[in-house]
Amino acid sequence: MENTQRSVIVTGGGSGIGRAVARAFAARGDRVLVVGRTAGPLAETVDGHKEAHTLAVDITDPAAPQAVVREVRERLGGVVDVLVNNAATAVFGHLGELDRTAVEAQVATNLVAPVLLTQALLDPLETASGLVVNIGSAGALGRRAWPGNAVYGAAKAGLDLLTRSWAVELGPRGIRVIGVAPGVIETGAGVRAGMSQEAYDGFLEAMGQRVPLGRVGRPEDVAWWVVRLADPEAAYASGAVLAVDGGLSVT
C-alpha cells in the first residue's frame, strides 16, 4: 500500500477512542486535527507528533463547525480525507431521573453535532473523495433494550441511520460514509458519566465475562479498524456499520 499523507479530523480526541484514533493516524504520518473541549488533554494526544494539531472547542457550540473549517484551511491544506465523528456524551439515568439538560446534552453531542460538522465539511470532503466515520455504539445495534442509557443509545442509533442515509446521499459526490460501533471499551467513560470507580470496575469485569472473546475492548482495538477503513483497499465500502465488540452484539 502506498503510504500517502492524508488530512484527518478526529472529534473527541482528548481521551479514549478518539485519542487512540488520532494517534494511530498521526503515527502513519498523516496530518491530524484533533478536536476536543479541553486544551490540556488534546496536547497530550498530539505530543510527539509534529503533523498533529489541536483545536479546543465545544463541538456543540454553534460556532464550532466554522472554527473547524478555518483550521482545515490553515492546517490541512483545505481538504479532508477522513472525518471521524467520535465526540460523545453519556449521562446514565432511568427515565424518571433525567432532567432536560441531560437529555439535550446527549442529543446535541451525539447526533446534532456530527450532522452540522459533516455538513460544514462537505466541500473539502468532496475535493478529497473523502471518508466520514461515525463512531456509534454496539449497544444501539439490533433490538436489545438499554435501560438506564436509553437516550444515549437512541442518539447513537440515530447516528447509524445517518451513516446509511449519507452513504446514499453522498456517494455520487465521491464521499464514503461508514459507521464503527464499539462495544464495551475501557476508556473511563463510565466514571465521567457519573459512575463511581468501584462501580465502573465492576461493570467492566462483569461485561468482560459476557463477551464471547472473554474481555472488554481497548481503544486501540477500535482505532485499528478506523485506520484500515480509510485505506485505499477499503474504497468500495460505504453504508455499513461495523461492530467492534468481541461478538457481544450477536449473543
Swiss-Prot record:
The active site is at Y152 (proton acceptor). Keywords: Antibiotic biosynthesis, NADP, Oxidoreductase. Pathway: Antibiotic biosynthesis; daunorubicin biosynthesis; Antibiotic biosynthesis; carminomycin biosynthesis; Antibiotic biosynthesis; rhodomycin biosynthesis; Antibiotic biosynthesis; aclacinomycin biosynthesis. SUPFAM superfamilies: NAD(P)-binding Rossmann-fold domains (SSF51735). It catalyses: aklavinone + NADP(+) = aklaviketone + NADPH + 2 H(+). One of its GO terms (biological process) is daunorubicin biosynthetic process. NADP(+) binds at D58, I59, N86, Y152, G153, A154, A155, K156, I185. One of its GO terms (molecular function) is oxidoreductase activity, acting on the CH-OH group of donors, NAD or NADP as acceptor. It is an enzyme of class 1 (oxidoreductase). Gene3D superfamilies: NAD(P)-binding Rossmann-like Domain. Its EC number is 1.1.1.362. Disruption phenotype: Cells lacking this gene accumulate maggiemycin. Disulfide bonds: none annotated. Coiled coil: none annotated. Involved in the biosynthesis of aklavinone which is an important precursor common to the formation of the clinically significant anthracyclines such as carminomycin, daunorubicin (daunomycin), rhodomycin, aclacinomycin T (aklavin) and aclacinomycin A (aclarubicin). These compounds are aromatic polyketide antibiotics that exhibit high cytotoxicity and are widely applied in the chemotherapy of a variety of cancers. Catalyzes the NADPH-specific conversion of aklaviketone to yield aklavinone. PANTHER family: EG:BACR7A4.14 PROTEIN-RELATED, ZGC:101858. Belongs to the short-chain dehydrogenases/reductases (SDR) family. This is Aklaviketone reductase DauE.
